[in-house]
Regions:
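Long, low-complexity, charge-dense
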Residues: 1-275
Length: 275
């Protein structure tokens, strides 16, 4: 499979049950150089998806042996967890940045909560919300620490000089705007008291009342279910969308994740193009 879409790894893993020998080809010289400086970044490399899948299973399951069915479910869980890192439909959590340690935080939390059990977030058909609660609870306990880590990393990056004399320098400066323009982020400041309130006031333009935060959290749970169905079945509702540019905080989301099986999205009858 060849393509530049960021979610191709998840899509190829999702198709392993029906295609055992999948390889992903991408031109990623910067990535190749970052993992091994002895490799030629201009050579062609392919990612063997079955080997990647087995490595993921071993990591999530703490190396324990499990049934083939459970292995498949572990991969479904991995795909589901990546939704928390953001995609075309959902923004990522400030505590979980895929460019830094977001994936590591997810895998560590999963291994600590579900890795030694036979529980799953999903079996590819159903979301088991009570099991998702276990994962999110672990993450929310470390949320402030993770956000502070990101804050410090961005402080270090912001100290870099970004000249703009040449076109190349101006392009790099443009790409670095999230590091340069940080007024809102610095105002929120996770090291200062009541930063959670400032998070909602600044990024959502709302008063952080319980009712307002609940609406955001429910909409985010809808987003998880909608994206899950979009990946595993079909688009459940062509008119649905996540209404905000940012996610709720994990410490708030945990309060609205159900302990039982339920649905937040009802499948709509309408087609993509209404007649």
């Amino acid at each position: 499979i060849y393509g530049l879409d960021a979610d191709l790894i998840m899509l190829t893993i999702n198709h392993l049950p029906i295609a055992k020998n999948l390889f992903l080809f991408r031109e990623t010289p910067h990535f190749i150089r970052s993992i091994d400086k002895t490799l030629d970044p201009n050579s062609l490399y392919m990612l063997r998806i079955p080997d990647l899948a087995q490595a993921i299973i071993n990591k999530l399951n703490n190396g324990n042996k499990i049934t083939k069915r459970q292995e498949k479910n572990r991969l479904y869980d991995y795909i589901f967890m990546t939704f928390l890192l953001g995609n075309d439909f959902i923004p990522h959590f400030p505590a979980l940045n895929i460019r830094t340690y977001g994936m590591d935080h997810l895998i560590d939390a999963y291994a600590a909560t579900l890795g030694n059990t036979d529980k799953n977030i999903t079996d590819g058909k159903t979301i088991y919300w009570s099991n998702l609660r276990l994962l999110i609870n672990n993450l929310q306990e470390n949320e402030q620490k993770f956000i502070e880590m990101e804050y410090e990393r961005r402080n270090r990056q912001a100290k870099r000089q970004f000249p703009n004399n040449t076109k190349e320098e101006r392009d790099e400066r443009f790409q670095s705007i999230p590091i340069i323009e940080r007024k809102v982020e610095l105002y929120i400041n996770p090291y200062e008291d009541f930063w959670q309130e400032r998070y909602y006031k600044q990024l959502f333009n709302i008063e952080p009342t319980e009712n307002n935060i609940k609406k955001i959290c429910i909409n985010f749970l809808e987003a998880l279910e909608w994206t899950f169905k979009y990946y595993s079945h079909k688009c459940p509702d062509w008119r649905w969308c996540y209404k905000y540019n940012y996610p709720p905080l994990l410490q708030d989301l945990i309060r609205y994740i159900p302990y039982f099986e339920t649905h937040f999205i009802r499948e709509a009858v309408k087609n993509p193009v209404d007649k």
